A protein has these predicted regions:
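Beta-strand signatures of extracellular beta-sandwich domains
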Residues: 72, 94-98, 127-129
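A short, Gly/Thr-enriched small/hydrophobic beta-strand-prone motif that recurs across taxa
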Residues: 64-82, 94, 171-172
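Short beta-strand/loop motifs in extracellular/secreted proteins, especially
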Residues: 91-95, 124-126, 368
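Short strand-edge motifs at loop-to-beta-strand transitions and within beta-strands
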Residues: 114-118, 158-160, 169-171
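A short, solvent-exposed beta-strand micro-motif common in secreted/extracellular proteins
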Residues: 124-135
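A surface/extracellular/periplasmic glyco- and lipid-processing/surface-interacting theme
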Residues: 1-25, 29-65, 178-448
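Short, acidic Ser/Thr/Gly-rich low-complexity loop/linker segments typical of extracellular
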Residues: 75-84, 89-91, 99-115
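Surface-exposed loops/turns
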Residues: 112, 122-123
């Protein structure tokens, strides 16, 4: 499913559903504004009222200064002691750090996604204590994979001694509701509603993306006449300016997807065009921060957080009195901060059809330069929609492919990917060590 999601006016934010999208494409819609096309497959978006602990929820990206110790506190819904897909983190859990003699050294808390961390001196021995709320219980510990299981004693919440000789990001704690737990009461008026969006009008770019996500189904809020005849649709929502656009009910999204699937059962498709691995590629340049500038009142940023091994997203408020002041960007469905394992800057040729209508070329057979940000580093790569051996053999298209300069597959980190599309003459600049500026350059004739 492809859904056109608004970013302007600023009342569209925070959007609902972006954290569930394997790929999000961001691009200019002229006049200094941008829009997103979110892909949904493999998992439907769902609203959530998150569990929280008794402590303050930590905010901001974790900044490493020494050797790291940390990871995540999560809700172990099935009580199997392992972090399974769909089991989310718990914010506001206090975590205490002790030295070898049992003296309390530091205290921190988990953030909205359940992550915590400490900067520590290498070669020392420490232990942790997770402080659970009264209505939650610890799951069994050491039930399997060290990166996925719980390490907290089910009675005390404490860990065994930990010797720090390198970054150690595998000390987790699983919690589940005990007999005294009462589910949070949904806030009917202000709580998350089962909707995605806001949904706005279609753009010419969507025809190209729909083409390489074969059997996909595009939903938008109509489009200008010259665009409407060129892009495929399987459904529309009403066009509304208030609140940044109309919201799409998740039940309707599911019904449209199921109807589309019934019509496509005889048509094969394959979305595995890229390579993913936890192993960090060599040769990248440090990139802890990405600053994105479309216009003075349209700025955003990405901060690398080593606890997540992903980039946390930040946005402005389009406030002329406070331009460029960023805050955490969250998903309206969950209240959790958006984080993406891969941020890719794609440089694509752009034609100006009219001052407010761009044709951004991701056509079949195209390609160009790109920049991959993953694991706190930047790697120059290329993008391609050209047919490879698979496409030539089967006649089927696959999604946009990311390649190293020698033509081998660029390796992405498993997880979600944010694709920022800019013109070939946009600025990609190192502002200071580890900090990149992506400044959009409008083609001649684009309304600013």
């Amino acid at each position: 499913m492809l859904v056109s999601i608004s970013n302007f006016p600023a009342t569209a934010r925070p959007q609902a559903g972006l954290s569930f999208a394997p790929y999000v494409f961001e691009f200019s819609i002229t006049e200094g504004q941008d829009r997103f096309l979110a892909t949904f497959y493999g998992q439907y978006p769902e609203p959530e009222t998150p569990f929280t602990g008794d402590c303050e929820v930590r905010t901001g990206a974790f900044k490493p200064t020494e050797t790291l110790l940390g990871n995540r506190v999560w809700l172990d819904s099935n009580k199997n002691g392992l972090q399974d897909p769909g089991e989310n983190g718990i914010g506001g859990i206090c975590v205490n750090l002790y030295d070898e003699q049992g003296n309390l050294l530091q205290t921190t808390t988990t953030d909205t996604n359940g992550y915590y961390g400490f900067n520590l001196e290498k070669g020392q021995i420490y232990s942790l204590e997770f402080v659970k709320p009264a209505n939650l219980a610890f799951t069994d510990r050491n039930t399997g994979n060290d990166n996925l299981d719980s390490d907290a004693d089910p009675v005390t919440g404490k860990t065994t001694p930990i010797t720090i000789d390198k970054d150690t990001l595998s000390w987790d704690a699983g919690l589940y509701p005990n007999d005294s737990f009462v589910s949070p009461t949904p806030d009917i008026k202000n709580g998350p509603k089962p909707q995605v969006g806001p949904v706005r009008s279609g753009r010419l770019l969507y025809a190209y993306i729909d083409g390489f996500f074969q059997n996909s189904c595009l939903i938008d809020a109509f489009a200008s006449p010259e665009v409407l005849v060129k892009i495929p649709h399987c459904s529309f929502v009403s066009h509304e300016d208030s609140g940044g656009g109309s919201m799409l009910e998740i039940d309707r999204l599911k019904a449209i997807a199921e109807d589309n699937m019934r019509h496509m059962t005889s048509r094969p498709f394959n979305y595995t065009s890229n390579v993913f691995s936890d192993e960090v590629p060599t040769g990248g340049l440090p990139a802890s921060q990405i600053n994105v500038f479309f216009a003075n009142l349209n700025q955003s940023g990405w901060s690398y957080d080593p606890l997540y091994q992903a980039y946390l997203r930040y946005v402005d408020t389009a406030d002329k009195n406070n331009p460029g002041v960023l805050h955490a960007d969250t998903d309206r469905l969950t209240g959790r901060q958006l984080h993406f394992e891969n941020v890719i800057v794609v440089m694509a040729d752009t034609d100006v059809v009219s001052p407010t209508n761009l044709d951004i070329h991701l056509d079949e057979g195209d390609g160009g330069y790109a920049y991959l940000f993953r694991d706190g580093q930047m790697i120059p790569i290329k993008w391609s929609t050209k047919a490879g051996e698979y496409e030539k053999l089967t006649g089927l298209r696959r999604p946009i492919q990311f390649l190293n300069n020698d033509g081998s597959p660029a390796v992405l980190r498993p997880g979600h990917t944010w694709v920022l599309i800019v013109t070939p003459f946009s600025l990609v600049q190192v502002q200071q060590p580890g900090v990149y500026l992506i400044r959009y350059a409008a083609p001649e004739g684009e309304s600013r």
